[in-house]
Regions:
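Active-site/acyl-donor-binding loops of N-acyltransferases
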Residues: 120-150, 248, 284-345, 349-354, ...
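A short, structural micro-pattern
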Residues: 82, 106, 126-129, 169, ...
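Short glycine-enriched loop/turn motifs at secondary-structure junctions
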Residues: 46, 80-84
Length: 360
């Protein structure tokens, strides 16, 4: 078990090689940047509780198990709460035992909420299953757009009409796929924090480690795995922006936001279409929109991957106590989110509370 800074260059190269062992078309989640060593190393630069268990066969790395841990041995997926793809990174044919893995890592339990598919080691702990919508651009932008027109004709017409109107009223429009100005990152975080407050959600950027993580990933590069800030400008003013994490094949969509002064133009949707085009032109195959019930995701997606939520445990009192505390909260949240007749009023209540707090 290593701290992130203790991994050798050879270990990091072996980790990346395991991710590339199968092509994106066969194992798209394996290429997700949240499973890359760069993300875990960035987490380690921002938090002290990050560890990596390395499974070796005949002295050669066969699997990497990044996680966070408490002194009592409660383990969590690295970045739990902000990472959209989690799991053990291993090559084809790897077999292992979850209990032995936990014992070797000194953990009583390991909790996850976005476990990737094809994780046989943790299959017994996988509970609730969720769709993770993706935009498939492997065949290019034009192919994606043609499919979007067929799947969501009204959405496509409306969004493209708003794009033309935005260009006419405030333009010309300009899209920067890889914006390197750190001031624009601060603008995005301010927009996102305001959105969290406006909709009654907890502000993720109120947690200093998340802000440090995003800034660290923004300044990482050049390289295949790094933060990617994309900005849509109308004239000289930014109207929408997105910060995500990219690998050679996958853009993990993470923090989208827009200037609410221009909400009538749906600049966030216009931005997502521009991102799809930019990703396709950059050689990527997928934009992973992440788990969660959102109408815009249903409109933009070509299909869904599967992620699961749950935990694997050893027979240990710490594991029992943690599950007793966490299970009721998780079950209630999933029940509300999974039933529209409960989710809609709960969502409306959060938004009213947000408006009250912000004076809206």
């Amino acid at each position: 078990v290593h701290r992130p800074g203790e991994l050798t260059a050879a270990d990091r190269a072996a980790w990346s090689a395991l991710q590339r062992a199968r092509p994106p078309a066969e194992a798209p989640q394996l290429h997700n940047p949240f499973l890359a060593p760069e993300f875990t190393l960035a987490m380690g630069a921002c938090r002290r509780d990050v560890r990596i268990a390395v499974v070796r066969e005949d002295g050669v790395p066969a699997a990497f198990f990044p996680h966070q841990r408490t002194p009592a041995g409660v383990g969590r997926a690295v970045g739990l709460g902000v990472s959209d793809c989690q799991g053990l990174v291993h090559g084809p044919g790897f077999t292992g035992d979850a209990v032995e893995l936990l014992r070797g890592a000194g953990l009583a339990l390991w909790e996850f909420d976005h476990l990737a598919a094809d994780q046989p080691v943790f299959a017994d702990g996988a509970g609730a299953r969720f769709g993770s919508p993706v935009m498939d651009v492997a065949d290019g932008w034009e192919s994606y757009l043609a499919g979007l027109r067929e799947r969501s004709p009204k959405f496509t017409r409306t969004t493209l009409a708003k794009e033309r109107r935005l260009d006419r009223d405030l333009g010309p429009l300009r899209y920067v796929h890889d914006e390197r100005d750190p001031e624009l990152l601060r603008v995005l975080m301010a927009w996102k924090s305001a959105q969290y407050r406006r909709t009654g959600r907890g502000d993720r950027f109120a947690k200093p480690w998340i802000t440090r993580l995003v800034e660290h990933l923004f300044h990482t590069g050049p390289g295949e795995v790094r933060g990617l800030l994309s900005v849509l400008y109308a004239g000289e003013r930014p109207v929408a922006a997105h910060f995500g994490l990219r690998s050679a094949a996958v853009l993990a969509c993470w923090f989208p936001a827009y200037d609410p002064a221009y909400a009538k133009y749906s600049p966030g949707l216009v931005l997502h279409l521009a991102m799809a085009r930019g990703a396709a032109e950059d050689g990527m195959t997928l934009l992973d929109l992440g788990r969660g019930r959102k109408e815009y995701k249903d409109s933009l997606k070509t299909r869904e991957l599967t992620v699961t939520e749950g935990w694997v445990t050893r027979r240990h009192p710490v594991a029992f106590g943690h599950r007793m505390r966490r299970a009721p909260v998780r079950a209630l949240r999933n029940t509300v989110q999974g039933r529209p007749e409960l989710f809609r009023p709960a969502d409306a209540l959060l938004k009213r509370m947000g408006q009250f707090r912000t004076g809206g």
